[in-house]
């Protein structure tokens, strides 16, 4: 077996891409075989598992959200927010220079859970306000204001907790995904979610907040 480490400033995928062709062109003696093992093999198997089970997990997520809210409009609002988080992730990858490999993908999947939690909390607060007889537009404003502090506190503690990992060779990409993705997703939660709610429910501003 042959093993090597990766110097700081380089990723495993980058190094593997540079040496793979030369290594695989080596003619082996009769009876000898060659295969990639260790971290490369483990990540490949993990990626296959994600590709296999992600559609089922996504379908279950939709079913749970519909059952939770009792309608389709609010789950659709949540699903509209999730892809937009990739904007923050892309910015993070470009600024830090990490590849969007296995660990960043794992970080993004974890990030989706945080986003869903924050959006559910905000939508639930809007629903509570409306059930209490508050005008729809007023309910959106007051719910967003009341949920801003908890959402920001949760996002800030998570982001600060990821900062030390940002400088790690193995987990730096995952940390960058969560830090930049969650920063952008928090803004989506507080600004885009209320706007989508008003659009889906055709709510217009009233004189108090116009």
Task: Annotate each predicted stretch with a short phrase.
Residues 14, 178, 190-194, 198:
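Short, charged alpha-helical segments
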Residues 1-57, 66, 137-139:
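Extracytoplasmic/periplasmic membrane-proximal domains and adjacent transmembrane bundles
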Residues 195-210:
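Interfacial helix-loop-helix hairpins and adjacent transmembrane helices
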Residues 44, 160, 197:
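Nucleotide phosphate-binding site architecture
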Residues 60-148, 152-171, 180-184, 188-191:
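Hydrophobic transmembrane alpha-helices and their membrane-interface caps
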Residues 20-27, 55, 64, 96, ...:
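Non-catalytic alpha-helical coupling and interface elements of nucleotide-dependent molecular machines
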């Amino acid at each position: 077996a042959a093993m090597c480490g990766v110097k700081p400033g380089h990723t495993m995928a980058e190094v593997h891409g540079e040496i793979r062709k030369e290594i695989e062109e080596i003619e082996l003696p009769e009876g000898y075989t060659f295969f990639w093992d260790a971290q490369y093999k483990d990540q490949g198997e993990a990626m296959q598992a994600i590709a296999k089970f992600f559609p089922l997990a996504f379908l279950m997520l939709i079913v749970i959200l519909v059952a939770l809210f009792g309608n389709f409009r609010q789950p659709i609002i949540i699903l509209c927010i999730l892809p937009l988080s990739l904007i923050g992730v892309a910015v993070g990858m470009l600024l830090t220079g990490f590849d969007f490999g296995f660990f960043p993908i794992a970080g993004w999947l974890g990030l989706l859970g945080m986003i869903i939690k924050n959006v559910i909390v905000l939508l639930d607060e809007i629903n509570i306000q409306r059930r209490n007889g508050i005008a729809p537009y007023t309910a959106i404003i007051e719910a967003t204001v009341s949920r801003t502090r908890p959402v920001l506190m949760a996002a800030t503690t998570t982001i600060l907790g990821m900062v030390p990992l940002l400088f790690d060779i193995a987990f730096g990409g995952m940390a960058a995904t969560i830090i930049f993705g969650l920063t952008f997703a928090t803004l989506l939660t507080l600004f885009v979610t209320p706007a989508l709610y008003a659009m889906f429910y055709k709510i217009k501003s009233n004189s108090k907040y116009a």
